[in-house]
Amino acid sequence: MNSAVQAQLAELGIEGYLNQHQHKSLLRFLTCGSVDDGKSTLIGRLLHDSKQIYEDQLAAVHSDSQRVGTTGSRPDLALLVDGLQAEREQGITIDVAYRYFSTQKRKFIIADTPGHEQYTRNMATGASTCDLAVILIDARKGVLDQTRRHSFISNLLGLKHFVVAVNKMDLVEFSQQRFEEIKAEYLAFSKNLRGETDIQIIPISALEGDNVVELSQQMAWYQGPTLLEILEAVDVEKEKEAGEFRFPVQYVNRPNLDFRGFAGTISSGVVKVGDRITALPSGKSSTVARIVTFDGDLEQAQAGLAVTLTLADEIDISRGDLIVHHGANVELTNHLAADVVWMTEQPLQPGRDYDIKIAGKKTIGRVEHIHHQYDINNLSKHSAAELPLNGIGLCEWTFNESIALDNYQDCADTGGFIIIDRLTNVTVGAGMVSESLTEVTKASSDFSAFELELNALIRKHFPHWDAKDLSELLKK
């Protein structure tokens, strides 16, 4: 038990502590930036200064600091996060490390993401579940390519709150002029980001603890909040609840003949008992009869809650269907444009079929065309015949069936999908819907999916056979 928990238990008692803890809001955030900007040290400082470290953890850090630490005689707080042996020996972050802590105001889940360019896919994975990005900048180096890269990816993945932490201010003598230079440079770059992004910029020293949990005595010229105060105050719940109601069905719950409900987690918006709803893609409508949870029925539920909905009418709804409010504007299409982050050595090439999973729905998709690849160091675009490992580009997709979806910026759960290799079952990429295109009408055919894949395989490996492209025949 850490000292913060002990203090709260002494003040509130066990029942009071558990009740308070249960009703705290949750913020998921990631730390990112260039290599050796101090991301892991910052998280270690947050945990240490908010008294979230157990005594045995602190003892282990003191011991390991003498062997692989980089802070001399002081404990290397980065070791609280860098758990892999390779990370500790190299002094870098490779995998996405998740840490949990809480204060009296809020609960937090931190994703510590790698800074190296070759681990961009790991960083994208960490960002996909977060609400806010803490982007670190070394005060000595300023805004680097990797800073721009991670800002772009965080923005692409729909994060609307950025905290830019100018770290290592102790190494530039806590210079206000240097901080203002970096602030101006980053704000100029941020004008190229999509949508409206809330950006706050603060000077910190993760090593010394300045402006992390406590205000700095060395930077009296900074009058803003500390990093922890920003994290405790940012409101992400209202944004999710303000969106249109989206409920991807994960499971049809039928424990007996008298009960049939549809289980899942509300992606956005609010639903109430008595609301008129429509199930997609069938288009059938009904009314919400009950909102069932483990703790009892609710009159209304909002984004983030896992619930089971029962309806007044018996309509056909299956796993992967989407329940929305009646009359909601939802795209139903098999043709779309999506930004893709590619995560495997074998490049993404047009014409190949992949398994697609989107909001509980599984289908088959194909890249028809790569419109462009992003140079995510300067946000420029260039033409590309394929997407390499860690490449990000805008691709045109067709699916085997029409699917109800949203733009990713509007709702990540119903606008994001994963791409799976059909032979190895490995997740090879992530897609974010940017635009729904005119639906492609496919002619009826006697060709099965297996025959189409076999045809593609033959044309690839035995071109001298001059086999015709069956998929092209279907378009005629």
From Swiss-Prot:
This is Sulfate adenylyltransferase subunit 1. Residues 167-170 are annotated as: G4. PROSITE patterns: G_TR_1, G_TR_2. It comes from Vibrio vulnificus (strain YJ016). One of its GO terms (biological process) is sulfate assimilation. Residues 24-243 form the tr-type G domain. Belongs to the TRAFAC class translation factor GTPase superfamily. Classic translation factor GTPase family. CysN/NodQ subfamily. GO terms for molecular function: ATP binding; GTP binding; GTPase activity; guanosine tetraphosphate binding; sulfate adenylyltransferase (ATP) activity. Residues 205-207 are annotated as: G5. Residues 91-95 are annotated as: G2. It catalyses: sulfate + ATP + H(+) = adenosine 5'-phosphosulfate + diphosphate. Its EC number is 2.7.7.4. The keyword Cytoplasm does not apply. GTP binds at residues 33-40, 112-116, 167-170.
